[in-house]
């Protein structure tokens, strides 16, 4: 009867820690409502993959028999071999996004670029702390505030920390209502937070709405080829939404596809949360660097808005810059809530929403930039390479966004 106790005897303290991590993620999903569609399956999966001799991961049984585990198979097929799961999720995300507020106020595009600063600041910090370049780049992409992008970039770059990166990315996305107000108050005054902004939306024609995702895909594909999979599927989802002839498919992409892929992605990514890989001091460092990235994203966007105000007669509420992260629509709602806390009559939701969807585009451009630059830089001199990625990455994002701005201006002129 010893076989009945084999599993118990094989338990390690690291596996017990992972059970606690899994239960905590499940608790955060159910009790606090933090990204439940992903944290709940991720938490349950963390328990599954850390059970001794678990049948969900590949095992060699007595007699040399190989037993294939379903979660390990899903990880190899859906993430490692093709990154198909995070990429397919972008179809659903694109179908959810309304670019109308952004297209009616194209200057909001700039805040999406400014709010990617945390990515590159975090890459530099990770490099200074001794992470190899590809791992530092993967950790930095947590600052994209975009879970699928974080997973895809870390997988393409072959990071050893994909599980910790995924947990950090989605956990901090859920904590946007806590992290962003703290960061914004660090660099703004009450007077700045009370600035009112006029909202005079210009109608956006159907032609522009259809042409925009096609043109953005082509431009970004030429400027940052490594972003094509990310931005292409995002814009394909948006084209399904805007074309007007695929209403049922648009609803399916927004609801059934997005929910199903998110569920599968959560439980699949848990394969990389095995105790021997996850319970390390590096995981704690990644969580700290990820938080730093989120804070610096917000600060970068806010400081860009404050810089622009030096040259504008009609001032921008600097909090709008903080909405330029990819956490949509959470960030725009947080900004509106903060504005009304300072002044109950201050409504800046639509401007914040425009900056927020700009962040969705900028984050996938940043993901492609990071992949390309990290692969081409000198892997030996990590800190210098991180500085190079920082300079070229931010310049590349702003260049791509400015080209898209020019495109929108041309489309609006032509459609009149």
Residue ranges and their predicted role:
Residues 31-39, 58, 74-76, 96-111, ...:
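Interfacial helix-loop-helix linkers and transmembrane-helix boundary segments
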Residues 77, 81-82, 91-96, 110-121, ...:
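Alpha-helical membrane segments and immediately flanking helix-loop junctions
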Residues 1-66, 71, 409, 415:
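N-terminal alpha-helical transmembrane segments of multi-pass membrane transport
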Residues 1-11, 16, 62-67, 182-211, ...:
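Intrinsically disordered, low-complexity non-transmembrane regions of multi-pass membrane transporters
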Residues 168-245:
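Membrane-embedded hairpin module used as a gating/binding unit in multi-pass transport
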Residues 216-301:
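Transmembrane helical segments that form the transport core of multi-pass membrane transport proteins
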Residues 25, 48, 79-103, 237-240, ...:
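Hydrophobic transmembrane alpha-helices of secondary-active transporters
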